[in-house]
Amino acid sequence: MTILRLNGGKILNEKVHEIGVIAMGSYLENHGSALPIDTDIKIASYVSLMACIKTGAKFLGTVIPSTEYSYVKHGIHNKVSDIVEYLTFLLTWAKRIGIKKVIIVNCHGGNILAEKEIKELENLINIKIKFLSFPLTHAATEELSIGYVIGIANKEKMKEHKPENYAEIGMVGLREAREKNKEIDEEAKRVEKEGVKIDEELGKKLLDEFINKVVNEITNFL
């Protein structure tokens, strides 16, 4: 049997090989004109991978299914049970490569609906799970700014990236969602008042905060 050189490379210590990071977001959601439909999962993947590079933890990939509140209609989503099924497969294989603790980095608000069921997998699979969520106002300034920093936002399309053109921006035009969810309505009102823009400094600041939070959780797991 091959003996692995666990102390190789730039890592916090050898125990970090027992920690995995999984990105969770959404692959199929409209995000106006300046951001791609898979913005959430790309941001979550970037944050997850950077935290792993900084610490030596293992980036275990992404959760493909996502879920959403029934009244938020801006994409194609799945059932909570689909997420649980996919994660069960992923976590079972993670254990086979020595993973004992996992941090799930979620950048899609709707996935919070699955948090309880995800935590229940701890006992089912016998693996420690930390669920970290970084919700951002949909397709608005924060997401635009982060997207620009990581290279997925198209600045040339910002002229048309407005709520009056795309209802999902800030969820301003998603009337049912605003009526049924107070937080969504408050965010939409803020977007109506302030508009949306790309702020590179804000994007860098938020990315650093998110990455550092994941790094801290990895450190706490050691």
Curated annotation (Swiss-Prot):
It is an enzyme of class 3 (hydrolase). Its EC number is 3.5.1.102. It catalyses: 2-amino-5-formylamino-6-(5-phospho-D-ribosylamino)pyrimidin-4(3H)-one + H2O = 2,5-diamino-6-(1-D-ribosylamino)pyrimidin-4(3H)-one 5'-phosphate + formate + H(+). One of its GO terms (molecular function) is ferrous iron binding. Requires one Fe(2+) ion for activity. Keywords: Hydrolase, Iron, Metal-binding, Zinc. Gene3D superfamilies: Creatininase. Disulfide bonds: none annotated. SUPFAM superfamilies: Creatininase. Fe cation 1 binds at E29, D40, H108. GO terms for biological process: F420-0 metabolic process; riboflavin biosynthetic process. The keyword Metal-binding applies. Fe cation 2 binds at H31, D40. Pathway: Cofactor biosynthesis; coenzyme F420 biosynthesis; Cofactor biosynthesis; riboflavin biosynthesis. Its cofactor is Fe(2+); Zn(2+). Catalyzes the hydrolysis of the formamide of 2-amino-5-formylamino-6-ribosylamino-4(3H)-pyrimidinone 5'-monophosphate (FAPy) to form 2,5-diamino-6-ribosylamino-4(3H)-pyrimidinone 5'-phosphate (APy). Homodimer. Belongs to the creatininase superfamily. FAPy deformylase family. This is 2-amino-5-formylamino-6-ribosylaminopyrimidin-4(3H)-one 5'-monophosphate deformylase. The gene is arfB.
